[in-house]
UniProtKB/Swiss-Prot annotation:
Belongs to the universal ribosomal protein uS5 family. The N-terminal domain interacts with the head of the 30S subunit; the C-terminal domain interacts with the body and contacts protein S4. The interaction surface between S4 and S5 is involved in control of translational fidelity. SUPFAM superfamilies: dsRNA-binding domain-like (SSF54768), Ribosomal protein S5 domain 2-like (SSF54211). This is Small ribosomal subunit protein uS5. The lineage of its organism: Bacteria, Bacillati, Actinomycetota, Actinomycetes, Micrococcales.
Length: 225
């Protein structure tokens, strides 16, 4: 039997420990790099899918729930999402953290998309929408007017791609009611082409004349330039 001295045993144990530590470190770095690649690819996918839409956070509210052990805080977010070209939706998200509440609101808004009829950059006719005690009036405007509206109404109209419009809030100033009243107004808009077919009229007899003149003047000036 060959006996090893204490120094040889200690050197061998140190070598084994260092080898194990090197192996575990390499495995940990490999797992970390794999997680990093997965996270980066997931973030790139989210950014590419969200890059096609406009997102506006209208309101963030903190809610407290009183329980036996104290108070539990959560957040709610009202979010407007649209493609800026006639499609818009509104969602409401709730979570324990603000970013998660906003992401839930975005997903909810995408499930509620609908199409907004437009004439050039404005709406085809005056319309009024109501939601609870909120009342919003929308009127067509000539090209170049811009969005004459407050914060909640402006967020909905910009995401819907309406760039020239006049608006007035006649009821509650609560942002949630105002947003849903604006949505109700947009949902009551009718496509001028379908109205003209139903009435047996020409398209330009349905659209307001001042809007037609303004659109024609803008087109003529662009052709001249």
């Amino acid at each position: 039997m060959v006996r090893q001295s204490g120094s040889e045993l200690s050197d061998q144990s140190d070598t084994d420990i260092s080898a194990d530590s090197d192996t575990s470190a390499s495995q940990g770095s490999a797992r970390h790099s794999a997680r990093g690649r997965h996270r980066d690819s997931r973030q790139k996918g989210d950014s590419s899918s969200r890059g096609q839409f406009l997102e506006r956070v209208v309101r963030i509210n903190r809610v407290a729930k009183v329980v036996k052990g104290g108070r539990k805080f959560s957040f709610s977010a009202l979010v407007v999402v649209g493609d800026g070209d006639g499609t818009v939706g509104v969602g409401y998200g709730k979570a324990r953290e603000v970013p998660l509440a906003i992401s839930k609101g975005i997903e909810s808004a995408r499930k509620n998309f609908f199409t907004v009829p437009r004439v050039a950059s404005t709406i085809p006719h005056p319309v009024q929408g109501e939601a609870a005690s909120g009342v919003v009036l929308l009127r067509p405007a000539a090209p170049g007017t811009g969005v004459i509206a407050g914060g909640p109404v402006r967020a909905v109209l910009e995401c819907a791609g309406v760039r020239d419009v006049l608006s007035k809030s006649l009821g509650s100033s609560n942002s949630i009611n105002v947003v849903y009243a604006t949505l109700d107004a947009l949902k009551h808009l009718e496509d001028p082409a379908s109205v003209a077919r139903r009435r047996g009229l020409d398209y330009y007899h349905v659209v307001p004349k001042r809007i037609v003149r303004a659109v024609n003047s803008v087109g003529a000036s662009s052709d001249t330039a």
